[in-house]
């Protein structure tokens, strides 16, 4: 189907199901003190600007978000976080750190933990090409606040977290 027009009738005739998986573009905020400091950005704002730059399009925002020459901290260990890591490296970040709330997943799925029972379905340690570009990764880190001066972020405060077995009363 690549390179040619496909009608809705073609899709209905040739497939039993059609899955549209464009990803979430609405950010999930981190409601902690200092979140509004300059220098704390949503991933999609950063990635969208880079996509516009690569396409040669004008940026719609007054203020550019660039990782060039900076120490960058990416919060979140999913695909979007991985995209931010790789983009930061390609923009010439000084160093890229990645914090994930969940504990480090196993490198191999334990035989006694089929996919529905593991904390994240099919979650095993994934290292993307973005991670292979360098940087540091840490797991079990929960952000408690950001602090800074003159309205600009300078420090992230966090605590180490460990997840225990689910509570039998509520499953959490």
In which residue ranges do the predicted regions lie?
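Glycine-rich dinucleotide-binding loop and its adjacent helix/turn
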Residues: 27-91
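A Rossmann-like FAD-binding core segment of flavoenzymes
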Residues: 1-28, 52-62, 89-172
């Amino acid at each position: 189907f690549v390179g040619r027009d496909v009608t809705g009738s073609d899709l209905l005739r040739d497939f039993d199901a059609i899955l549209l998986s464009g990803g979430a573009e609405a950010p999930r905020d981190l409601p902690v003190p200092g979140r509004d400091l300059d220098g704390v950005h949503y991933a999609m704002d950063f990635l969208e600007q880079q996509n516009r730059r690569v396409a040669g399009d004008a940026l719609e925002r007054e203020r550019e978000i660039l990782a060039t020459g900076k120490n960058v901290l990416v919060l979140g260990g999913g695909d979007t976080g991985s995209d931010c890591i790789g983009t930061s490296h390609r923009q010439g970040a000084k160093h890229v750190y990645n914090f994930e709330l969940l504990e480090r997943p196993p490198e191999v799925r334990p035989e006694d933990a089929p996919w529905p029972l593991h904390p994240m379905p099919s979650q095993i340690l994934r290292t993307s090409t973005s991670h292979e570009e360098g940087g540091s990764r840490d797991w079990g880190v929960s952000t408690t606040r950001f602090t800074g001066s003159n309205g600009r972020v300078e420090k992230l405060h966090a605590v180490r977290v460990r997840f225990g077995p689910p509570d039998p009363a509520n499953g959490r």
